[in-house]
């Protein structure tokens, strides 16, 4: 274990009192592994800690938190200039952990930590919106975005990813589709969308497989649109007979342009972005990530 490379863990402030994590880090340190720990408090901390990690010369920056933390650390890493950019490690500590789950990251802290420190580093894609904001997992629009942003923190803490589904059922009366136009490579669609998922990864909202065919190293974004007037029948049909569902539109492209006559909001791995025009493109091989050898998101 003493030969493991040095790493810096960027820990979401909500996980600072995680005793099992403290114990796991302590055991690794006792075995000679060099692990620096930094805790985020406010927006911009991840960028500062990534800069510090490069100064320390560590080989891995570990994102300890949920999808939002992973996204923030990833966005900071792709801003690095020059060589010796650390790889990304993932320690799933959030409510839903959608990206980590679909990537096959172990749930056990000790196993996830060892993978994050010494796993094989693979080049993966990341998505960029309007030439500035990034997401590593998925951009969701429509009803799903409102649910994930409005679900109470206490409900998420008590029930985890299931809380999104429960809160969604409670808010069905507010369901309204968003009219928009979406263009991509050999793709064009215009109409009313209940839910829009644009995935580099596969799932969002606590385990919902919105883009089940997505891969994180194929240079493509996967698109899925739920249309129609009723959301529950569309979702049920997706689970039972997705290939026969007329209310589902699928597409794949290295980029998508979205225009709407009114303001709509996308949730980018937990970060809301509102507007009427969105240009979303894939950045191939944008960073290296330590993943399990049988990661289902790799081609």
Curated annotation (Swiss-Prot):
GO terms for molecular function: ATP binding; lipid kinase activity; magnesium ion binding. Mg(2+) binds at residues 215, 218, 220. Gene3D superfamilies: 2.60.200.40, Probable inorganic polyphosphate/atp-NAD kinase, domain 1. Keywords: ATP-binding, Cytoplasm, Kinase, Lipid biosynthesis, Lipid metabolism, Magnesium, Metal-binding, Nucleotide-binding, Phospholipid biosynthesis, Phospholipid metabolism, Transferase. It is an enzyme of class 2 (transferase). PROSITE patterns: DAGK. Its EC number is 2.7.1.-. InterPro entries: ATP-NAD_kinase_N (IPR017438), Diacylglycerol/lipid_kinase (IPR005218), Diacylglycerol_kinase_cat_dom (IPR001206), Lip_kinase_YegS (IPR022433), Lipid_Phosphate_FormReg (IPR050187), NAD/diacylglycerol_kinase_sf (IPR016064), YegS/DAGK_C (IPR045540). It is found in: Cytoplasm. HAMAP family: YegS (MF_01377). This is Probable lipid kinase YegS-like.
């Amino acid at each position: 274990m003493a030969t493991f490379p040095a790493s810096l863990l960027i820990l979401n402030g909500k996980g600072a009192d995680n005793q099992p994590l403290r114990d796991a880090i302590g055991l690794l340190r006792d075995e000679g592994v060099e692990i620096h720990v930094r805790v985020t408090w406010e927006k911009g901390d991840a960028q500062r800690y990534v800069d510090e990690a490069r100064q320390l010369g560590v080989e891995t920056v570990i994102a300890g938190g949920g999808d939002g933390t992973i996204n923030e650390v990833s966005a900071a890493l792709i801003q690095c200039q020059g060589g010796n950019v650390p790889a990304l490690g993932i320690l799933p500590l959030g409510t839903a952990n959608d990206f980590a789950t679909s990537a096959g990251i172990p749930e056990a802290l000790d196993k996830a930590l060892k993978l994050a420190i010494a796993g094989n580093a693979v080049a993966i894609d990341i998505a960029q919106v309007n030439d500035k904001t990034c997401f590593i997992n998925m951009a969701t629009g429509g009803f799903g975005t409102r649910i994930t942003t409005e679900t109470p923190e206490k409900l998420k803490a008590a029930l985890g990813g299931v809380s999104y589904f429960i809160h969604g059922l409670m808010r069905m009366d507010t369901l309204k589709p968003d009219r928009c136009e979406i263009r991509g490579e050999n793709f064009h669609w215009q109409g009313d969308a209940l839910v829009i998922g644009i995935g580099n990864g596969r799932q969002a909202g606590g385990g919902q497989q919105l883009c089940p065919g997505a891969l994180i190293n194929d240079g493509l974004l996967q698109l899925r649109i739920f249309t129609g007037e009723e959301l529950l029948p569309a979702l049920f049909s997706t689970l039972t007979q997705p290939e026969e569902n007329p209310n589902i539109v699928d597409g794949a492209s290295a980029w998508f342009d979205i225009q709407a006559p009114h303001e709509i909001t996308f949730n980018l791995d937990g970060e809301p972005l509102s507007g009427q025009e969105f240009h979303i493109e894939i950045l191939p091989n944008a960073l290296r990530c330590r993943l399990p050898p049988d990661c289902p998101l790799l081609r």
